[in-house]
């Protein structure tokens, strides 16, 4: 049997796998257990009461976190003309059309988010096999295919998170850094949960949000008592 690392032993001793923790207690535990030498992200996993095999029950969208993600986001925009100038003024890192597509084909993708105006999708559409697997393909549901590219750029820079459930009906997202204050993490989580609730498929039956777990980049998941979320704010 492999030896447990010092951190793994600490997690085992501190975190009860079956317990639902008060939100503030959970964040305090995460901070105590965050021993990595880099600024760890705070990640959330939201288990949904959906049948992920049915396309009409899949949940997808985007929301801007009130306190940002703590990450510097690089944004590439596929557009032209006046929209190109608007994107640059809004803070886009790279703006182009066919020239940007050529960079992508060469594997030069020094960006975290891709935005496209509708007229640019003829170019972006040919990059689906490259951008899709990396989670970078623009989509109207996440606000990244839009005629208002300037707002999309500003949202991305302000800490917008894009979310979608995986094949097990779980949404994974980063909602800040471990250095954030507890109330900042709670406000970000509340914004994400509110957006996910609004995106509830009409065909989903029963309990919609079944479980919420928080973890850090290198840490174990801690299940949150949902009743404590409103009490924490």
Curated annotation (Swiss-Prot):
Record field: transmembrane: none
Gene3D superfamilies named in the record: 3.30.190.20, 3.40.50.790
Biological process, per Gene Ontology: regulation of translation; translation
Molecular-function GO term, any one: tRNA binding
Summary of subunit composition and partner proteins: Part of the 50S ribosomal subunit.
Matching HAMAP family: Ribosomal_uL1_B
Role played: Binds directly to 23S rRNA. The L1 stalk is quite mobile in the ribosome, and is involved in E site tRNA release.
Protein name per its UniProtKB record: Large ribosomal subunit protein uL1
Native organism: Pseudoalteromonas atlantica (strain T6c / ATCC BAA-1087)
């Amino acid at each position: 049997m492999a030896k447990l690392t010092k951190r793994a032993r600490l997690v085992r001793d501190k975190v009860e796998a079956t317990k639902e923790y008060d939100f503030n207690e959970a964040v305090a535990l995460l901070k105590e257990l965050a021993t990595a030498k880099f600024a760890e992200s705070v990640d959330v996993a939201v288990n949904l009461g959906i049948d992920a095999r049915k396309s009409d029950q899949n949940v997808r969208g985007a929301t801007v976190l009130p306190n940002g993600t703590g990450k510097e986001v690089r944004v590439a925009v596929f557009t032209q003309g006046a929209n190109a100038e608007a994107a640059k003024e809004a803070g886009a890192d790279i703006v182009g059309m066919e020239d940007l597509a050529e960079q992508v084909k060469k594997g030069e993708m020094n960006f975290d988010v891709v935005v496209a105006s509708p007229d640019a999708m003829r170019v972006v559409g040919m990059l689906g096999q490259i951008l899709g697997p990396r989670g970078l393909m623009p989509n109207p549901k996440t606000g990244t295919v839009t005629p208002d590219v300037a707002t999309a750029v500003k949202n991305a820079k302000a800490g917008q998170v894009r979310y979608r459930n995986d094949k097990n009906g779980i949404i994974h997202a980063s909602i800040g850094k471990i250095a954030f204050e507890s109330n900042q993490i709670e406000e970000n989580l509340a914004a994400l949960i509110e957006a996910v609730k609004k995106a509830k498929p009409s065909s989903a039956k029963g309990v919609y949000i079944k479980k919420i777990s928080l973890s850090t980049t290198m840490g174990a998941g801690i299940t949150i008592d949902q009743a404590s979320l409103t009490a924490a704010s």
